[in-house]
Regions:
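Pyridoxal 5′-phosphate
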Residues: 6-288
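Acidic, Ala/Val/Gly-enriched low-complexity intrinsically disordered segments
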Residues: 2-4
């Protein structure tokens, strides 16, 4: 059976329904993850974590170990550096396929939370002065805190759409009364880590665009990415952020997609560097 250098199988296996999973298949699946039934500190245990993370694939550990040992930086004129650049370019293309994002660009950051703060900051500071920043009470503190801070600095009002306690959701109909032509930035939580419910991002985006077509719309997809498909091309948004450690990867980095429009806003960049680059410093190729 063909595998890559990190032990990932190159074929797509058809996964049987849960009732048909054999002991051998279950053992095969469990064998792909680290610390399945044992904590290095606690000893034997079952990993029940509803929102804070996921088990880590052994292939992720091997991949991280491999690239952590390479001393070369990206952007140098040598074979090692060229390979790192190739790996990153391929990873970005794969991300576009995985999240159906034929346009825009991907970049890495410290964490999903840090990336949401950065996108919100640049959207608030780069949009027309005044107006509103719109979110909902369903959202994680990552977006609510970022919007509260940067709306105040940008001289904008931060408005929160109340969610429905009974359904654990917020809908396009809930957003609609609060959208005005002065809505500069809007945030949407794709899936709640508290209620477990997913919202209709495309419907909420459409309601916003109808009244405020120039609004920068940023989506917190951190919890959703582990549980549902992502179709960025269908959402009509400007930013989408995930935390790969919730998808069987590891801690230590986050992933953001941004539209060309958001990417072109003023942002932190090195003197003499590419003006559309949102990554500062050398990237961890193993994360890609």
């Amino acid at each position: 059976e063909a595998t890559d250098r990190f032990g990932n199988r190159n074929e797509l296996r058809k996964i049987a329904p849960m009732s048909e999973i054999s002991p051998a298949l279950l053992e095969d699946i469990r064998g792909k993850f680290a610390h399945v039934d044992n904590c290095p500190q606690q000893g034997p245990r079952v990993f029940f974590e509803n929102a804070g993370g996921a088990l880590t694939l052994n292939s992720v550990v091997r991949c991280s170990h491999h690239y952590a040992a390479i001393p070369d930086n990206q952007g140098r004129d040598n074979a090692g550096s060229h390979e790192l650049v190739r790996v990153i370019a391929k990873a970005k293309k794969d991300m576009g396929d995985f999240m159906n994002a034929p346009d825009g660009s991907f970049f890495m950051g410290e964490s999903g939370t840090e990336l949401l703060f950065r996108l919100i900051m640049n959207a608030c500071l780069g949009s027309v002065a005044g107006g509103d920043v719109l979110g909902s009470t369903l959202e994680h503190p990552a977006t609510r805190s970022g919007c509260a801070r940067w709306a105040k600095i940008a001289g904008q009002s931060h408005i929160l759409v109340p969610h429905d306690d009974a359904t654990g959701l917020v809908t396009a109909q809930d957003y609609a009364p609060h959208v005005t032509p002065e809505t500069r930035v809007a945030t949407i939580l794709h899936t709640s880590p508290v209620t477990g419910m997913a919202v209709d991002v495309a419907a909420i985006s459409a309601v916003i665009r109808k009244v405020a077509p120039a609004c920068f719309i940023i989506v917190d997809g951190i919890q959703h990415a582990a549980h549902g498909g992502i179709d960025i091309a269908s959402y009509d948004v400007d930013g989408y952020v995930i935390s790969p450690y919730k998808m069987f990867s590891r801690h230590g980095y986050g992933l953001a997609w941004i539209s060309d429009r958001l990417r072109s806003l003023p942002h932190d960049v090195l003197f003499g560097g590419p003006k559309d680059n949102w990554e500062l410093g050398t990237r961890d190729t193993g994360a890609y």
